[in-house]
Curated annotation (Swiss-Prot):
Reaction(s) this enzyme catalyzes, per UniProt: (2R)-2,3-dihydroxy-3-methylbutanoate = 3-methyl-2-oxobutanoate + H2O; (2R,3R)-2,3-dihydroxy-3-methylpentanoate = (S)-3-methyl-2-oxopentanoate + H2O
GO biological process, alphabetically ordered: isoleucine biosynthetic process; L-valine biosynthetic process
Cofactor annotation comment: Binds 1 [2Fe-2S] cluster per subunit. This cluster acts as a Lewis acid cofactor.
Organism in which the protein naturally occurs: Methanosarcina barkeri (strain Fusaro / DSM 804)
Residues forming coiled coils: none
Name listed for the protein in its UniProt record: Dihydroxy-acid dehydratase
PANTHER family on file: D-XYLONATE DEHYDRATASE, D-XYLONATE DEHYDRATASE YAGF-RELATED
Lineage: Archaea, Methanobacteriati, Methanobacteriota, Stenosarchaea group, Methanomicrobia
PTM-bearing positions, type N6-carboxylysine: K121
Active site per the UniProt annotation: S470 (proton acceptor)
Keywords: 2Fe-2S, Amino-acid biosynthesis, Branched-chain amino acid biosynthesis, Iron, Iron-sulfur, Lyase, Magnesium, Metal-binding
SUPFAM superfamilies in alphabetical order: IlvD/EDD N-terminal domain-like, LeuD/IlvD-like
């Protein structure tokens, strides 16, 4: 066992003495040491229950003859960090989480790890650590929260964000906004739609790194506690089998994960996280692969924010395994999973509990919701290296649109003008200097897009940015524009009134300005300087472009 390096032989008497100070017995010294990597904290709704899941995991480890050791990682709530300076720290936290897990596991020579994350950047941070460390690992994602219920319909956090826009135009009273605020987030768990956290949980299950059914089992569901305990039991067997992440995850696994992502209409943030994750597995996953598979993989389930259904409905309809069953003719069924079985073997054992709901909300390949997958990659002279849009959440009227630019150099300026009514139907809002280096930190523009949505403008106004979007964003919102403005990308050269062409079916994003004019603007371009200190200064120096996953050297 790896852990023998800290507990075997007379020269390790001091190490054993310290372990015994924690209560470890001589008999436990002969058992596998399993790290339980918990991202529990008191401020993230998606994480407030993870202490209980960790206890279930540890019980499972003990049941199977292992010795659990729990330690914690940090976590940022994107919803609480949204719309202000705090969002600059969300994406950078991904690598900090990964690094801290590596430090703890390497320093203490654990035999295996159980990773317990829930929310947006925390799941990819844990997954990236698993790929980098390559010791037996299993992931227990924390599960979605229950949706709210207001005015006789289900609600979620996006209902509240869009309520702000509706309130600003007088469409919603202060009382009604307060009701949304009070009742839309139902307690423990990740936000209730197919936003980034739940997308990443689905991707984790599709990659084979969590047990079947884990992604959609809700935070308050006893099923989640059982999966946590079973994961603890399974990790001990994985240590004995030496079944490591790189034996499970291959390039074909990533293709499976992307196809599931496309079928469920997942968050555009996967185009950042999956390439970064592939990098830690020693693989190259180009942005173009997402578009290739999107053209081949239909959108099969209409979930929030692009449709009426919530994660609760998805779970009852069968969750990720049900979608993979629909996609089985396209998937690589020979890929291994953490339970030691292949994707195909798991699907053969999968049982649909609610056949009526399964049929109602998960479409078939023959009659999909949309013929193409949830995400499209656009290129053109405004985004030579690519940009992304959640096409499954775009109104058909806005899939092709040309309009004048309204240019803002930060999210705050854009938000002020949107709420002041300065953005009109037909406009294309441009928010720049919000990329990985320019922000720094590549903030999400959910406050801006939700305000536009709440004001009823998503059928007439588009937004393009070198920043990114929440998984809760809907509408013609195009992000991750590469190269970004701070690196002299064409988005830095856009002026108010310039015409921008968006054509999602043709995958085009063009600035309708002559090459000669653009060359003149480029010659005069001087990027603005921002005062950046602390961790963000280090991040700014080492982060790469969004089209390669925003990885950090």
């Amino acid at each position: 066992m790896r852990s023998d390096i800290i507990k075997e032989g007379p020269e390790r008497a001091p190490n054993r003495s310290l372990l015994k100070a924690t209560g470890v017995t001589d008999s436990e010294m002969r058992k596998p040491f399993i790290a339980v990597v918990n991202s529990w904290n008191d401020i993230i709704p998606g994480h407030i229950h993870l202490n209980k899941l960790a206890e279930a995991v540890k019980a499972g480890i003990r049941n199977a003859g292992g010795v659990p050791f729990e330690f914690h990682t940090i976590g940022v709530c994107d919803g609480i960090a949204m719309g202000h300076e705090g969002m600059k720290y969300s994406l950078p936290s991904r690598e900090v989480i990964e690094d801290t897990i590596e430090l703890m596991v390497k320093a203490h020579q654990f035999d295996g790890i159980v990773l317990i994350p829930t929310c947006d950047k925390i799941v990819p941070g844990h997954l990236m650590a698993a790929g980098r460390l390559d010791i037996p690992a299993i992931v227990v994602t924390g599960g979605p929260m229950l949706p709210g219920y207001v005015d006789d319909k289900y609600t979620d956090l996006i209902s509240v964000f869009e309520g702000v826009g509706a309130y600003s135009t007088g469409k919603l009273s202060e009382r009604d906004l307060k009701r949304l605020e009070n009742l839309s987030c139902g307690g423990a768990g990740s936000c209730a739609g197919m936003f980034t956290a739940n997308t990443m949980a689905c991707v984790t299950e599709a990659l084979g790194l969590s047990l079947p059914g884990c992604a959609t089992a809700h935070a308050v569901d006893a099923k989640k506690a059982r999966i946590a305990k079973e994961s603890g039991e399974r990790i001990v067997e994985m240590v004995k089998e030496n079944l490591t992440p790189r034996k499970i995850v291959t390039f074909k696994s990533f293709e499976n994960a992307i196809m599931v992502d496309m079928a469920v209409g997942g968050s555009t943030n996967t185009t950042l996280h999956l390439p970064a994750l592939a990098h830690e597995f020693g693989l190259n996953l180009p942005l173009e692969k997402f578009d290739e598979l999107s053209r081949e993989t239909p959108h099969l389930i209409s979930l929030r924010p692009g449709g009426p259904n919530f994660m609760l409905h998805f779970d009852r309809a069968g969750g990720v395994q049900a979608v993979m069953q629909r996609l089985s003719s396209k998937l690589h069924l020979d890929q291994l999973t953490v339970n030691g079985k292949t994707i195909g073997e798991n699907l053969n054992e999968f049982e649909i509990i609610n056949p009526k709901l399964n049929k109602e909300i998960i479409a078939t390949l023959e009659k999909p919701i949309h013929a193409e997958g949830g995400i499209a990659v656009l290129k053109g002279n405004l985004a030579p290296n690519g940009s992304v849009v959640k096409q499954a959440a775009v109104d058909p009227k806005m899939r092709v649109h040309t309009g004048p630019a309204k240019v803002y150099d930060c999210e705050e300026d854009a938000m002020e003008n949107i709420l002041a009514g300065n953005v009109k139907p037909g406009d294309i809002v441009v928010i720049r200097y919000e990329g990985p280096k320019g922000g720094p930190g590549m903030r999400e523009m959910l406050a801006a897009t939700a305000a536009i949505g709440g004001m009823g403008l998503l059928e007439s106004v588009a937004l393009v940015t070198d920043g990114r979007f929440s998984g809760g964003t809907r509408g013609p919102c195009i992000g991750h524009i590469s190269p970004e403005a701070s690196e002299g990308g064409p988005i830095a050269l856009v002026k108010d009134g310039d015409m921008i062409e968006i054509n999602i079916p043709e995958r085009v994003l063009n600035l309708k300005v002559s090459e000669e004019e653009l060359e003149q603007r480029k010659a005069a371009f001087v990027p603005p300087k921002k005062e950046v200190t602390g961790y963000l200064a280090r991040y700014q120096r080492s982060v790469h472009s969004a089209n390669t996953g925003g990885i950090v050297d």
